[in-house]
């Protein structure tokens, strides 16, 4: 059995998935120019530190990447242990990934080229692209939100600046308001939503004006924070006991100094969902069946929608 985390682009859906599956023996062509299909699953194959793209129509693996064939120096290959998030960015032409061993990386799909990578800490969960092309990551072990200058000539990078945020698991950029959002665990063990401004300094990127904008009374373990399809002012949040929606309608843009809070609605009383997204055809969730991963996706009713072979 193999461990996977999976990011799916299928019928308008985007989601991270953990799955356990046997090997797929279909060969993956490495020397052709690649374009991401409209319906595809982008998987982080934790057993061999790899990323695999699987065509959702044919159920065949059509693209793969790993730090060994990419000639990552041996001393840094351990950074890519247990990929934790993989997602298409820049109009689906690149993959942005994090791995529990510490890696954050940007990979070009067309030719498998590693464009940028760095170490962002002991247990990163998520990364996001900032407006100028720099990258920000969330790392839970030390509770850090870190920025990186993306230099595709040097390729290997390092942290530029870091702010502390306990049990950081997610980062989402709000293009409309020019804020970065992330959740954290605060005193008392409850989850809170924070926002940051980005200073836009391409060569020395910093997050500023850290502000707590929503605090749960009892909820803990904030995990996945992700935009709601079809509702530009809303974000999904999965946590220890339920699934929520934040409504940011009353939050003005970063040019003001207001302290408006979002509203929050409990949507599903479903515990320990690792990832969620929605699209034209409904809702996808990852509900772990073994530790942090599962063999497939379910909908909001718990009905199986997708399952890996094996």
PLM features per residue range, with description:
Residues 4, 14-34:
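Bacterial Sec-dependent N-terminal signal peptides
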Residues 56-61, 149-154, 196-206, 247-258:
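Short loop/turn segments immediately following beta-strands, especially the blade-tip
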Residues 221-310:
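Long, ordered, amphipathic alpha-helical scaffolds
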Residues 65-126:
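Blade-loop segments of beta-propeller domains
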Residues 75-87, 121-130, 165-172, 217-229, ...:
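Repeated scaffold domains used in trafficking and secretory/extracellular systems
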Residues 61-77, 112-118, 156-163, 209-216, ...:
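A short beta-strand motif characteristic of beta-propeller blades
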Residues 37-40, 91-94, 132-134, 176-178, ...:
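Short coil/turn segments that connect the beta-strands within blades of beta-propeller domains
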Residues 42-47, 89, 96-101, 136-141, ...:
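Conserved beta-strand positions in repeat-built beta-propeller and related beta-rich domains
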């Amino acid at each position: 059995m193999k461990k996977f985390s999976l990011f799916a682009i299928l019928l308008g859906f985007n989601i991270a998935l953990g799955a356990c599956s046997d090997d797929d023996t279909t060969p993956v062509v490495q020397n052709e120019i690649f374009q991401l299909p409209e319906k595809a699953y982008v998987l982080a194959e934790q057993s061999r530190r790899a990323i695999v793209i699987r065509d959702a129509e044919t159920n065949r693996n059509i693209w793969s990447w790993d730090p060994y064939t990419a000639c990552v120096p041996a001393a840094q290959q351990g950074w890519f242990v247990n990929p934790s998030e993989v997602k298409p960015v820049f109009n689906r032409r690149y993959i942005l990934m994090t791995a529990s061993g510490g890696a954050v990386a940007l990979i070009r799909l067309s030719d498998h080229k590693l464009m940028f990578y760095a170490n962002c800490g002991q247990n990163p969960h998520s990364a996001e692209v900032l407006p100028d092309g720099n990258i920000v990551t969330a790392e839970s072990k030390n509770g850090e939100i870190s920025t990186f200058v993306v230099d595709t000539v040097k390729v290997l990078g390092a942290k530029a600046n870091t702010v502390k945020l306990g049990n950081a698991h997610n980062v989402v950029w709000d293009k409309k308001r020019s804020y970065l959002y992330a959740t954290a665990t605060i005193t008392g063990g409850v989850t809170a939503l924070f926002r940051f401004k980005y200073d836009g300094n391409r060569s020395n990127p910093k997050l500023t004006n850290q502000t707590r904008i929503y605090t749960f009374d009892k909820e803990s373990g904030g995990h996945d924070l992700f935009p709601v399809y079809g509702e530009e002012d809303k974000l999904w949040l999965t946590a220890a006991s339920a699934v929520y929606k934040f409504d940011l309608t009353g939050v003005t843009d970063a040019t003001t100094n207001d302290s408006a809070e979002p509203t929050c609605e409990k949507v599903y009383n479903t515990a320990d969902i690792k990832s969620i997204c929605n699209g034209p055809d409904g809702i996808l969730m990852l509900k772990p069946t073994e530790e942090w991963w599962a063999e497939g996706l379910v909908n909001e009713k718990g009905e199986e929608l997708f399952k890996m072979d094996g």
